[in-house]
């Protein structure tokens, strides 16, 4: 199933050599997104950097776009999306940026056009809170954080 998302390259950015976010395989859930940089960006271990993409989106109402790490960058270099998954709300119209953190032991340099994250379009359900005096009992109860073993 496809859903239309409006895409705008931002003026004054080096976007001519960039491609639209794209699914790399037929069964892919995420679209790879590239960095839009004026100069290389080196991320030292422990550092967090906001990488621009050079575009803005209009996401349909009732949807979000999740910003997720690329597995190869995470496994090979320790580079991941700092707030994974990040959320781009349907009413946001600014430039999409990707917050990356280097959890590895060596510096990682990002170049213009490098694929830095994945974008996943997902439906959104909004909650309606109901205040109650008691919750329905379950077998699990209040057990959490390791209650089923390691």
Swiss-Prot record:
GO BP terms in the entry: dUMP biosynthetic process; dUTP catabolic process
HAMAP family assigned to the protein according to its UniProt record, in alphabetical order: dUTPase_bact (MF_00116)
Top EC category: hydrolase
Pathway: Pyrimidine metabolism; dUMP biosynthesis; dUMP from dCTP (dUTP route): step 2/2
Lineage top rank: taxon: Bacteria
Keyword tags: Hydrolase, Magnesium, Metal-binding, Nucleotide metabolism
Organism listed in the record: Desulfotalea psychrophila (strain LSv54 / DSM 12343)
Cited InterPro entries: dUTPase, dUTPase-like, dUTPase-like_sf, dUTPase_trimeric
Cofactor(s) listed in the protein's UniProt record: Mg(2+)
Descriptive protein name: Deoxyuridine 5'-triphosphate nucleotidohydrolase
Pfam families per the UniProt record, alphabetical: dUTPase
Annotated positions binding substrate: 70-72, 83, 87-89
Family designation: Belongs to the dUTPase family.
GO molecular function: dUTP diphosphatase activity; magnesium ion binding
Function: This enzyme is involved in nucleotide metabolism: it produces dUMP, the immediate precursor of thymidine nucleotides and it decreases the intracellular concentration of dUTP so that uracil cannot be incorporated into DNA.
Catalytic reactions on record: dUTP + H2O = dUMP + diphosphate + H(+)
Enzyme Commission identifier(s): 3.6.1.23
Ion transport keyword on record: no
Keyword tRNA-binding attached: no
């Amino acid at each position: 199933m496809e859903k239309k998302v409006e895409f705008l390259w931002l003026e004054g950015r080096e976007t001519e050599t960039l491609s639209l976010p794209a699914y790399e395989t037929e069964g892919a859930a995420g679209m790879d997104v590239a960095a839009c940089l004026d100069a290389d960006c080196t991320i030292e271990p422990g550092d967090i950097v906001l990488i621009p993409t050079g575009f803005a989106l209009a996401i349909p109402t009732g949807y979000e776009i999740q910003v997720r790490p690329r597995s190869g960058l995470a496994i090979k270099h320790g580079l991941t999306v700092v707030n994974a998954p990040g959320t781009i709300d349907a009413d946001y119209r600014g430039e999409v940026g990707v917050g990356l953190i280097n959890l590895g032991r060596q510096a990682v340099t990002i170049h213009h056009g490098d694929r830095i994250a994945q974008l996943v379009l997902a439906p959104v359900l909004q909650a309606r809170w109901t205040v109650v005096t008691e919750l329905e009992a379950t077998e699990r109860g209040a057990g959490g954080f390791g209650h089923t073993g390691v």
